[in-house]
Curated annotation (Swiss-Prot):
Subunit architecture: Component of the pre-catalytic and catalytic spliceosome complexes. Component of the postcatalytic spliceosome P complex. Part of the U5 snRNP complex. Interacts with PRPF8. Component of the U4/U6-U5 tri-snRNP complex composed of the U4, U6 and U5 snRNAs and at least PRPF3, PRPF4, PRPF6, PRPF8, PRPF31, SNRNP200, TXNL4A, WDR57, SNRNP40, DDX23, CD2BP2, PPIH, SNU13, EFTUD2, SART1 and USP39. Component of the minor spliceosome, which splices U12-type introns.
Alphabetized UniProt keyword annotations: Isopeptide bond, Methylation, mRNA processing, mRNA splicing, Nucleus, Repeat, Spliceosome, Ubl conjugation, WD repeat
WD repeats: 64-103, 107-146, 149-189, 191-230, 233-272, 283-322, 325-357
Subcellular location field: Nucleus
Designated name of the protein: U5 small nuclear ribonucleoprotein 40 kDa protein
Annotated SMART domains: WD40 (SM00320)
Listed InterPro entries: G-protein_beta_WD-40_rep, U5_snRNP_Component, WD40/YVTN_repeat-like_dom_sf, WD40_repeat_CS, WD40_repeat_dom_sf, WD40_rpt
Gene name per UniProt: SNRNP40
Cross-link Glycyl lysine isopeptide (Lys-Gly) (interchain with G-Cter in SUMO2) per UniProt, renumbered positions: 18, 270
Alphabetized Gene3D superfamilies for the sequence: YVTN repeat-like/Quinoprotein amine dehydrogenase
Top-rank taxon: Eukaryota
PROSITE patterns in the record: WD_REPEATS_1 (PS00678), WD_REPEATS_2 (PS50082), WD_REPEATS_REGION (PS50294)
Length: 357
């Protein structure tokens, strides 16, 4: 009955129209329901700039943390990464494919403030507000050592690049400590006046470099067991330190909204600050915003409270990238060891991994 009530339209001749190939390609990747269509490879190539990494997509979102994410580091082999923060958990992720969270390391009873792999990637070190530093086997995920001795929050840790496995730590108790993971207690302690927020070794691991709320960067000599020299220039707390891969220059991030490069070679001129970068900002949240070098030293990156990822050209000091996307303070940005990829950790509980040219 329904068929009979339909009015017939005018009889029009059907004329086939040959569509150009580029129209077919564009049509395959656009319009409603495009996701269900079998787009040809040509359509994907036309979607954006050429790809420059092995990531599944130019930007990958890693979500799984239940609180602010304070730190993130790529494994030295580049295939996995670790992240940690306020939820006291360390999450391990695959870099390629779907970026699965393949393991969760539990053991800290306070927020995890900083993470570092050792040089060969066999161990992962984590500093926590539970006053301890944990040493993890990165293959099995087991905690193999717990370093206890600080009397307040441990804000920073850094493993020696070579030699016996030493690690230095900095704490709110105002001390910088040196540990040999084969021993139970710290093997050296340096007393600073104020809270220590960031530490690293020099290239030969015979000096510890520290920064904190006294605005100064201090270099402690392990052989002579004393303060060797102090680098002044920042006008507010130093929240992040990073040594360049060849060991000649130190990067610092501070609450005076500057990122600085310092010459830490022996017998360098007295004025060791060689470059100042601006753009990133700190705010009332007072998060410990870190900083990092690209593997070849041509770029630097730093955390920022304005929700942007900042990447600078080291030579020209120009901002190469100011990347949006996060909804909270960016606490750390790290470079991939082999590919043009960066990862950012944010107070919005997320990590973004993306490729840069």
């Amino acid at each position: 009955m329904i068929e009979q009530q339909k009015r017939k339209g005018p009889e029009l001749p059907l004329v086939p129209v040959k569509r150009q190939r580029h129209e077919l390609l564009l049509g395959a990747g656009s319009g409603p329901g495009a996701g269900q269509q079998q787009a040809t490879p040509g359509a994907l190539l036309q979607a954006g700039p050429p790809r420059c990494s092995s990531l599944q997509a130019p930007i990958m979102l890693l979500s799984g943390h239940e609180g602010e994410v304070y730190c993130c580091k790529f494994h030295p082999n580049g295939s996995t990464l670790a992240s940690a923060g306020f939820d006291r958990l360390i999450l391990l992720w695959n870099v390629y494919g779907d970026c699965d969270n393949y393991a969760t390391l539990k053991g800290h009873s306070g927020a995890v403030m900083e993470l570092h792999y050792n040089t060969d990637g066999s161990m992962l070190f984590s500093a926590s507000t539970d006053k301890t530093v944990a040493v993890w086997d990165s293959e099995t995920g087991e905690r193999v050592k717990r370093l206890k001795g600080h009397t307040s929050f441990v804000n920073s840790c850094y493993p020696a690049r070579r030699g016996p496995q030493l690690v230095c730590t900095g704490s709110d108790d105002g001390t910088v400590k040196l540990w040999d993971i084969r021993k139970k207690a710290a093997i050296q302690t340096f007393q600073n006046t104020y809270q220590v927020l960031a530490v690293t070794f020099n290239d030969t691991s015979d000096q510890i470099i520290s920064g904190g709320i006294d605005n100064d960067i201090k270099v402690w000599d392990l052989r002579q067991n004393k303060l060797t020299y102090t680098m002044r220039g920042h006008a507010d707390s130093v929240t992040g330190l990073s040594l360049s891969s060849e060991g000649s220059y130190l990067l610092s991030n501070a609450m005076d909204n500057t990122v600085r490069v310092w010459d830490v070679r022996p017998f360098a001129p007295k004025e060791r600050c060689v470059k100042i970068f601006q753009g990133n900002v700190h705010n009332f949240e007072k998060n410990l915003l870190r900083c990092s070098w690209s593997p070849d030293g041509s770029k630097i990156a730093a955390g920022s409270a304005d929700r942007f990822v900042y990447v600078w050209d080291t030579t020209s000091r120009r901002i190469l990238y100011k990347l949006p996307g996060h909804a909270g303070s960016i606490n750390e940005v790290a470079f991939h060891p082999d590919e043009p990829i960066i990862i950012s950790a944010s107070s919005d509980k997320r990590l973004y991994m993306g490729e840069i040219q």
